[in-house]
Amino acid sequence: MWGTARHKLLVLNPVSTDVWNDLTLTHVKKILSPEIEVSVRSLSEGPPAIESEYDRDLAAPHVVSEVIKASKEGFHAVVINCFDDPGLRASREVSKILVLGIGETSLAVATLLGYRIAVISTGSKYSRTAYYRRAIELGLEKRVVYASGVDIRVLDLRKDLNTVKKALLDEAKKAINEFNAEVIVLGCSGLIGLSEELSEVLGVPVVDPTLVTVGLAEAMIKLGLRHYSYKP
C-alpha cells in the first residue's frame, strides 16, 4: 500500500520564459494523484525556446543547476520538460533523486504501444536529423520509422491551435499512410493536451510526452525507483 504521504515533483521547463508554466501545471494536475505535490518552474537564464542543438546545449548547465537546487529543496523527482532532454545525463550524475526527460521517457513508452514509431515535433529540418539520431542513441533506430515536424515556431504553438492541429494531422497521416507508423509521439512539450483529440481522429495511439513522463514519474516515486547514478 502506497499510503498518503506527500511526494514532491518538479516539472522544469528548460527555457528562460515562464509562458508555459501555467499551461503545464493545469494539465499535469489533471493526471496526478493528491499525494503528489507538483511545482512547475522555468530557468532564470537560457534560451527562450529550444529549437536547435545550440539551444539545447545552452540550456543544459542551467538545467543541471536547477536539478541540484531541487534535490536540496526536498523534491523526489524532476521532469525535464523538453523533448531534447537538455542536461539529462549530467543531471543524473550530480543528483540522487529521480530525473526523467520527456524525450527519452516518451519514446520508451511508445515501444509498449506499437512497433513502428513516428515522432512529430516542430521544425521539420531539425526534427528529421535530431530525432533519427536520438533514436540511434536509444537503440530504437529500427523502431522510429518517421521523424519530422510542423514548421511553426515553438513560441507560436498556442496562438492558432486549429492551424497547429491541422499541421500535426497532416504529418501524422503521412507517417501512418506512407511509413506504416503505429504510434505517434508528439516531440514538443508545447503540444501538451492535444494527444487525445489527435488519437481519436487518427485511430492510433498518440503520446503526450509531458503527461506520460509525469505519470511515470509519480509511479516511480511511489515504487522507490530512481536511475542508476555515478559520479565521474
Predicted ranges, named:
Residues 41-61, 155-161:
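N-terminal beta-loop-helix "entrance" segment that forms/cooperates
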Residues 53-73, 163-171:
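Glycine-rich, highly charged phosphate/nucleotide-binding loops
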Residues 80, 84-87, 169-201, 213-214:
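Hydrophobic alpha-helical
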